[in-house]
């Protein structure tokens, strides 16, 4: 999926919502535990209930890998289900990979060749040769960690060099030498607020994947005020605030209502550019 197709989906659905599939076997409704594959059964119900309200899904690999082979099978089935039934959805593998070149090449092969996923989150700490293997696949995206929403982001990402440049700013500037805004996005946490204004001075045209709205306390209005550009430029993720709002047999209906509430807010924000 290219940048224009992504923007067309945003305009059509009046939404830039990404539903995070952070599926924890300990948190799904109890009645699903009797299913042959409880994780996939949960994901399928959430996807069917929200697909017309969002433009992306983001399975977090840690939740699947923690269950071993069963978890990976559920992940593969989830990706396949989205691709076959909702082909307009942008799929993000939230894997946060990034290693020496030949290792990154294997990670890239997993997500882009074997699973044919649209994008993968990548950690930039090891530099260019850890990222470029992901960029050899035409039509696929790298979503580079830039400024995250966790408290620990202050430990490294906000530290300044002798010239006053913060580490996340250096990541943004340097990585533009590796790919343009048709191949690369950045993770910027919703809790970072006014930092979006500084980020847009460096990467005015790139899409930003924004976690942290909802359960983590980020403000959608503030993110849009400082982060939205002429093609929206935002994919805002919500996980717990949608998928875990109800643990009864009506969990999917409740998830839909939660997603709908966010979509309505997004439609209002999009009026500024549409």
Curated annotation (Swiss-Prot):
It catalyses: orotidine 5'-phosphate + H(+) = UMP + CO2. This is Orotidine 5'-phosphate decarboxylase. Keywords: Decarboxylase, Lyase, Pyrimidine biosynthesis. PANTHER family: OROTIDINE 5'-PHOSPHATE DECARBOXYLASE. GO terms for biological process: 'de novo' pyrimidine nucleobase biosynthetic process; 'de novo' UMP biosynthetic process. Its EC number is 4.1.1.23. The keyword Lyase applies. Pathway: Pyrimidine metabolism; UMP biosynthesis via de novo pathway; UMP from orotate: step 2/2. The active site is at 96 (proton donor). One of its GO terms (molecular function) is orotidine-5'-phosphate decarboxylase activity. NCBIfam families: pyrF_sub2. It comes from Bacteroides thetaiotaomicron (strain ATCC 29148 / DSM 2079 / JCM 5827 / CCUG 10774 / NCTC 10582 / VPI-5482 / E50). The keyword Lyase applies. Belongs to the OMP decarboxylase family. Type 2 subfamily.
